[in-house]
Amino acid sequence: MQYEDYILRLFWEASLPVPHPLGIVEITPEREYLLVTEFINGAQEAGEAEIDESVIDQGLAAVRRMWDIGMAHRDIKPANLLVRDGDLFLIDSAFAEVRPSPWRQAVDLANMMLVLALRTDAERVYARARRQFSDEEIAEAFAATRGLTMPTQLRRMLRQQGRDLHGDFLRLLPFRLPPVHIQRWTWRRFGLTVVTVAAAGVAAVVTVGLLGSPL
């Protein structure tokens, strides 16, 4: 809860289009807390709202601003983009990250473009994106984004529409970059895991020995 409040305040202070944070309310001491924010009354999710060029520009500008301040939202999907009277709001910062990897930031861009294209088309979104991002940045975003890097809701809506928006964006690019593989395991991570397990085993043996020895 404290982390989400902190992230939301960083977004707010950086002039990102997020609900105004109003603080934390304690419901049950040391157990339940509630993060209070401005309520975006009358807003619609991006998957249902009318998306015009102004809204597209606002969504892309939000990603550019996060890049500039060294942050990533990490959960850009229709439910987390609200539109009211032509204004876009970015909500739910629980998974946001400070000083993310370039890969994380690239994924934010591709997911934002995919969400905005759900109610428009890849051509319009790509044309607007080129006003704020280079072709190389957009190519990197779509090289990093596919399958598990897309939020579940976004993948489901793409399937329901029967549109290959990811493929549409790739076809618009002047060049493609090799897909960035999600590396779940590396030799370094494997080695650290083995060392940790071995150390835990040694500690357990020593503890059992001490407990079994006479005082």
Give the residues covered by each predicted segment.
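Conserved short alpha-helix within the protein kinase catalytic core
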Residues: 49, 53-60, 64
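Catalytic activation segment of kinase domains across protein kinase-like and atypical kinase folds
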Residues: 25, 29-36, 72-114
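C-lobe/activation-segment region of protein kinase-like
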Residues: 91-155, 164
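Structural motif in protein kinase domains
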Residues: 41-47
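Regulatory N- and C-terminal appendages and interdomain linkers associated
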Residues: 148-215
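Protein kinase catalytic-loop region centered on the HRD/HxD motif
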Residues: 64-71
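Conserved ATP-binding subdomain of kinase catalytic cores across diverse folds
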Residues: 1-38, 68
